[in-house]
Amino acid sequence: MEQIPFVSSAPNTLGIELELQLVDPRSFDLAAASDELLAQLANHPIADRVKPEITRSMIELNSSVHEHPAGLLAEMREMRDVLCEAADAVGVGVTGGGAHPFMRWQDRAISDTPRFQYLAEMYGYLARQFTVFGQHIHLGVPSGDAAVRMVRGLSPYVPHFIALSAASPYCEGVDTLFSCCRLNAVNSFPLAGHMPADVTDWYRFEAHLAQLCASGLAESIKDLYWDIRPKPEYGTVEIRVCDTPLTVERACQLAAFAQALAVQVARDPEPSQQAWLAYRSNHFQACRFGLHGSYVTPDGQRVRLVDHLRALFERLAPVAEELGTGDMLQTLRDEILRNGNDARWLRGQFLKVRELPLVVESMAQNWRGQGVQDTPPSAVRRRIRATSEPVGGVCALSTPQGDPLPGWAERLH
């Protein structure tokens, strides 16, 4: 069995990756413009932190390593501004959000790299449907054994990350009734899911991966689309379930939450095997109903996820004070409990403007840090008619009376 070296990292360090949407500033449909944007940034100092993604309507923005989320936020704001300036130069918009509200997967162009071309050949249409946008949070750990313990400790909190970050209620022009529909695309891949419960240390992780490779089920760790996975070449644990938020501020708040939670779970006893029994159900509840899903705790109690999350914020408050991140966690807590997640905000925008292209326009404004400006629906219709391929079929799931149902996923519990 081949040993996998694990690069040691300082505990509690953190970094993030954000997968971002590139949109046409007239129609607000996705734009296959990653090559042009990357060329525009080629001579800029942040060039090595902006990467192509599986389709040409996406790019990935990578932070450096930070000890404190405040430094992360300063860097992400600077990179956001540079990215938006470059995007303006090539005539494209940039936005967050976990899924584009009305894109057609059939129209996506695969990026011209060997790995992405291989994925397109291997997975067929799933590769184009994988035009979804996530935030990955990296947490530094000193060893492979520590990484496996961290994955196991964080796994019961996967629903909390999903609900906090959910920003993908719409897909192909309809309200999916999910807070997070993005993970339905991720879960189509054969090695999606969670780390097996019997992987309890780095040796067992190496053995598990070796077995997958020997069976032809995987070629490397990159093929493990787990919700949380070790990243040995970085010396991190990577949380992969978050939708890309609508702002860099929310992205860094989520990173601060992850950092405090990682410190707490390192102090806690390891969850029992029973914690894995409800994993898939908890995952579904968070995707479908967001903050108002139900949650089965590691000891088997069924509660509302929002109530468990409220208690978790209280539990993490002393840890956040130790880390100097109390204000960021308090802001996240207050905004989430008062206003809900980004999925709820997006549905609220649709109720105001009744046009999904206008919703995307407001997403792009939010990403720039400009706030939302009112744009008459007639203006976006003029922009759509001006394009060569007008957007059609934009609608929301509705009642027999024709009233949209954007609140189902927030009201059922």
From Swiss-Prot:
<keyword id="KW-0067">ATP-binding</keyword>
<feature type="region of interest" description="Disordered">
    <location>
        <begin position="392"/>
        <end position="413"/>
    </location>
</feature>
<dbReference type="GO" id="GO:0042398">
    <property type="term" value="P:modified amino acid biosynthetic process"/>
</dbReference>
<comment type="similarity">
    <text>Belongs to the glutamate--cysteine ligase type 2 family. YbdK subfamily.</text>
</comment>
<dbReference type="InterPro" id="IPR050141">
    <property type="entry name" value="GCL_type2/YbdK_subfam"/>
</dbReference>
<dbReference type="Pfam" id="PF04107">
    <property type="entry name" value="GCS2"/>
</dbReference>
<dbReference type="InterPro" id="IPR014746">
    <property type="entry name" value="Gln_synth/guanido_kin_cat_dom"/>
</dbReference>
<dbReference type="InterPro" id="IPR011793">
    <property type="entry name" value="YbdK"/>
</dbReference>
<protein>
    <recommendedName>
        <fullName>Putative glutamate--cysteine ligase 2</fullName>
        <ecNumber>6.3.2.2</ecNumber>
    </recommendedName>
</protein>
<keyword id="KW-0436">Ligase</keyword>
<keyword id="KW-0547">Nucleotide-binding</keyword>
<comment type="function">
    <text>ATP-dependent carboxylate-amine ligase which exhibits weak glutamate--cysteine ligase activity.</text>
</comment>
<dbReference type="InterPro" id="IPR006336">
    <property type="entry name" value="GCS2"/>
</dbReference>
<dbReference type="GO" id="GO:0005524">
    <property type="term" value="F:ATP binding"/>
</dbReference>
<dbReference type="GO" id="GO:0004357">
    <property type="term" value="F:glutamate-cysteine ligase activity"/>
</dbReference>
